[in-house]
């Protein structure tokens, strides 16, 4: 499977910002028996990477192409460990706090602009591909405070102090980070599994019982190299993030992904940009958000600007896809700002620049991705991401790139051999923690094993029985 084709549309744009973002980091002792090699400099990496990509100009989807990157071009981190939408879980668990429909939609936006904080705080890199049946799980005991000055480096511990955002019927809040004062501790659990190899798809599930909120979805990418940049968009099975508020009559929000671009190859400074539209819809409340990302400004200067609108819509006749096409009478709020800086909103239908009172949705400047708790390595299964890739990770960290490439190639060959065995036996691989590889459409369901794994994370019981069969070894 192509190393450029991980399981999520954003995984190929992963950044080094969270290079030590797990309490059980994939950094163990340096392998013995192989000498350390001189690491390539960034310029050399770019030239090698660009040379590989140029072979695929015109290929419609790099995710469908088989090629292998040398280990020295990889970030020593598994995709499933790195990629998730909980860079700031504090914003996630506060989505359902408001008693007003508009307040909850604004809560979704606050989560949206922080879920991929790694792209704002770090530089692009390439983690490992996920193998079929590989999985990763996180247990986070958290008390949430968005602007905590001293973020712990071994877990997600912040106070549940997010206020609801101001709406026409709510009392004003002095700032988006003001404190509610209950200091409640909650637990957020997360599990993801590589459910398909062709095409590469992973399923994920997030659960916070104390707050009555969960999220699920499939991650899959489609990638194309244009000659100067890589355009990465959601694959056919990736319909976005589906968030359910159980305490709000199972109110569901669908958040779709915009296309992202990895550029800067010619300048030797890789960067992530977004120039596309995305949508947040809630059929129960009849509210929809359109966000339009505008990458380039005057004379090509990047502004990373985003504009948007929250409006009343007909879920049975949803055909409005552009901000300019939204009837003014249906507009509840307008959004504008820089997704790498501050994003604001105004209430009502008037143009954003004609409303004097602007409210802060989020300021990402003081924020960093929050570390996560994972099971101890000795309690992980052989196909659990950190343990599965341990040898490759250790070799890369020890600058033993020849050894790392050899170990990585061995993993790839074993996976192909297992796939050939299943094909010869006419046997279909079935995920362990999710009911289907790509079904139900858009919204994966947990198996009894998946539900049990989540329950174990809630109470810090990590031991799981071994698989009856492994897909990649």
Please provide the spans of the model-predicted regions.
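Extended acidic, Ser/Thr- and Pro-enriched interaction/regulatory segments
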Residues: 2-94, 102-473
């Amino acid at each position: 499977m192509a190393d450029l084709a991980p399981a999520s549309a954003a995984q190929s744009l992963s950044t080094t910002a969270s290079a030590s973002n797990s309490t059980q980091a994939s950094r163990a002792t340096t392998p013995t028996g192989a000498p350390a090699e001189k690491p390539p400099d960034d310029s050399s990496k770019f030239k090698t990477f660009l040379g590989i990509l140029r072979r695929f100009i015109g290929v419609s989807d790099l995710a469908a192409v088989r090629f292998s990157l040398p280990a020295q071009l990889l970030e020593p981190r598994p995709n499933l460990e790195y990629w998730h939408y909980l860079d700031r879980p504090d914003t996630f668990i506060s989505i359902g706090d408001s008693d007003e429909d508009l307040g909850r939609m604004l809560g979704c936006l606050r989560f949206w602009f922080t879920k991929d904080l790694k792209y704002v705080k770090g530089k692009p890199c390439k983690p490992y591909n996920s193998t079929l049946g590989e999985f990763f799980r996180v247990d986070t005991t958290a008390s949430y405070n968005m602007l905590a000055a001293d973020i712990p480096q071994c877990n997600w511990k912040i106070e549940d102090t997010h206020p609801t955002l101001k709406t026409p019927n709510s009392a004003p809040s002095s700032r988006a980070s003001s404190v509610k004062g209950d200091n409640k501790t909650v637990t957020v659990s997360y599990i993801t599994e590589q459910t398909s190899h062709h095409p590469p798809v992973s399923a994920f599930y997030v659960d916070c019982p104390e707050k009555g909120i969960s999220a699920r979805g499939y991650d899959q990418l489609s990638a194309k190299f244009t000659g100067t940049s890589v355009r990465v968009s959601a694959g056919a099975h990736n319909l976005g993030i589906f968030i359910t508020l159980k305490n709000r009559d199972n109110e569901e929000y669908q958040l779709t992904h915009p296309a992202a671009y990895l550029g800067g190859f010619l300048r030797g400074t890789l960067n992530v940009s977004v120039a596309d539209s995305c949508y947040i819809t809630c059929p129960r409340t009849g509210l929809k958000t359109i966000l339009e990302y505008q990458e380039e400004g005057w004379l090509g200067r990047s502004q990373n600007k985003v504009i948007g609108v929250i409006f009343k819509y007909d879920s049975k006749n949803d055909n409005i896809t552009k901000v300019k096409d939204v009837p003014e009478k249906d507009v509840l709020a307008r959004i504008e700002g820089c997704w790498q800086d501050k994003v604001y909103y105004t209430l009502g239908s008037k143009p954003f620049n004609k409303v004097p009172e602007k409210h802060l949705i989020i300021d990402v400047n003081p924020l960093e991705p929050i570390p996560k708790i994972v099971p101890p390595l000795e309690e992980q299964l052989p196909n659990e991401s950190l343990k599965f890739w341990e040898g490759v990770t250790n070799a890369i960290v020890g600058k033993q790139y020849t050894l790392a490439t050899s170990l990585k190639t061995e993993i790839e060959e074993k996976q192909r051999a297992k796939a050939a065995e299943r094909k010869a036996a006419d046997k279909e691989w079935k995920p362990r923690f999710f009911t289907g590889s790509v079904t139900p459409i858009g919204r994966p369901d947990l198996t009894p094993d998946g539900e049990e794994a989540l329950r174990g994370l809630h109470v810090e019981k990590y031991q799981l029985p071994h698989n009856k069969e492994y897909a990649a070894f």
